């Protein structure tokens, strides 16, 4: 998917309207608790400012449901960005309207302003054409650098592209397309996918799309129990999607028919209850006690999966191996993160599809050992499903 990028345009003297993902966590005092998303947008922001562009930033924050919600103002974000850039950031009171427009027109080369939360207007998520047109009038060139919302057809991601002469991808989206796109279109082999998470229903489309592309799939997370039930095993009180057992059988048959190695765990860490202080035992998957539930992959599985990971040249990971929020059941997920970092050190390309897997890598302190950690959980999942992302499709080719 070749899209025009920030590198293809001249910003000098132009009003550059950039959609960023500044949906950062705030504490009760309105203080930003993690500014990673702001830092990730800095390369694109600096590119515009250093080449003499007049930058107008827009983002959403939280879920104000189309109403002005003072505690979800982007003002704290503008302050933090100002510190990071060591320059003033003009904060608008709205994202459209006469006052915001006058502030945009008053910008000089190398200056930056932040529009107020897009989702204070219900028209944003409805992709309202009039609202999109009004946003578009703020700038002369549109840059989308918000991969996390690229799978949403909103006014600031999709609608706006119909009303600006030039719309291009920022550096963050360019990087996402390069790694995720290449992994799916032209991977170095062996190509291995690791899929975790609680439910098969959330991963059906990913599995379907990956069956045409990968050599090996490793399965973890609670969805393994629906597969085991489909194979006739007793799984104790483990989570099972009863209505997906037939589908699990079908997926196992499909993998076999396509000659794909689809590995399921050999053992699990079982617990008497879903709790940190529950009694636990390591058991083979054919001997899960009927009063216990599996909450993580076991040591034999960790060993097998780690060996598979070290054989691969391209690795995509989406979803944890167990209930990694509870330390007692985080071992499998953290071990997979370490194996991924080891494989990367040996020259493999490792890609993590945002969300919980990314959180696990951060928890293990291994983010610098991974080739690419996607900035969008839902967007990367839809990309892996082979779906077109509206916010990217709308950009200039």
Swiss-Prot record:
This protein's GO cellular component annotations are:
cytosol
- UniProt keywords, alphabetically: ATP-binding, Cytoplasm, Glycolysis, Kinase, Nucleotide-binding, Transferase
Compartments reported by the entry? Cytoplasm
Q: Which InterPro entries match?
A: Phosphoglycerate_kinase, Phosphoglycerate_kinase_N, Phosphoglycerate_kinase_sf
User: By its UniProt entry, which Pfam families does this protein fall under?
Assistant: PGK
Q: Which GO terms describe its molecular function?
A: ADP binding; ATP binding; phosphoglycerate kinase activity
Per the record, the similarity remark reads: Belongs to the phosphoglycerate kinase family.
Q: How does it assemble?
A: Monomer.
What's the protein here called? Phosphoglycerate kinase
Q: Its gene?
A: pgk
């Amino acid at each position: 998917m070749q899209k025009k990028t920030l590198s293809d345009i001249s910003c000098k003297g132009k009003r550059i309207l950039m959609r960023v993902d500044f949906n950062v966590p705030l504490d009760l005092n309105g203080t930003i608790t993690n500014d990673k998303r702001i830092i990730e947008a800095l390369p694109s922001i600096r590119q515009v400012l250093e080449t003499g562009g007049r930058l107008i930033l827009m983002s959403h924050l939280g879920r104000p449901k189309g109403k002005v919600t003072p505690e979800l103002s982007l003002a704290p974000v503008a302050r933090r960005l100002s510190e990071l850039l060591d320059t003033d950031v003009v904060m608008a009171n709205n994202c459209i309207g006469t006052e915001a427009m006058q502030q945009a027109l008053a910008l000089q080369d190398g200056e930056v302003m932040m529009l107020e939360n897009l989702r204070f207007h219900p028209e944003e998520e409805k992709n309202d054409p009039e609202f999109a047109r009004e946003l578009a009038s703020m700038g002369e060139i549109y840059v989308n650098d918000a991969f996390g919302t690229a799978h949403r057809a909103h006014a600031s991601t999709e609608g706006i592209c119909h009303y600006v002469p030039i719309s291009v991808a920022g550096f963050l989206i360019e990087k996402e397309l390069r790694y995720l796109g290449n992994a799916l279109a032209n991977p170095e082999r062996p190509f291995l996918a690791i899929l975790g998470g609680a439910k098969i229903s959330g991963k059906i489309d990913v599995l379907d799309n990956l069956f045409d592309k990968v050599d090996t799939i490793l399965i973890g997370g609670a969805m393994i129990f629906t597969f085991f039930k489909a194979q006739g095993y007793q799984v104790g009180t483990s989570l099972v999607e009863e209505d997906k057992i037939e589908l699990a059988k079908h997926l196992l048959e499909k993998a076999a028919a396509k000659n794909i190695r689809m590995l399921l765990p050999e053992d699990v860490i079982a617990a008497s209850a879903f709790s940190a202080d529950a009694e636990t035992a390591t058991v083979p998957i054919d001997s899960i006690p009927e009063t216990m539930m599996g909450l993580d992959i076991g040591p034999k599985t960790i060993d097998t999966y780690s060996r598979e990971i070290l054989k691969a040249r391209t690795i995509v990971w989406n979803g944890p191996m167990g209930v990694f929020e509870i330390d007692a059941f985080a071992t499998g997920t953290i071990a997979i993160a370490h194996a991924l970092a080891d494989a990367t050190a040996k020259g493999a390309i490792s890609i993590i599809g945002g969300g919980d897997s990314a959180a696990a890598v951060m928890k293990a302190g291994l983010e610098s050992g991974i080739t690419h950690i996607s900035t969008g959980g839902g967007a990367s999942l839809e990309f892996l499903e082979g779906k077109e992302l509206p916010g990217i499709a709308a950009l200039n080719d």
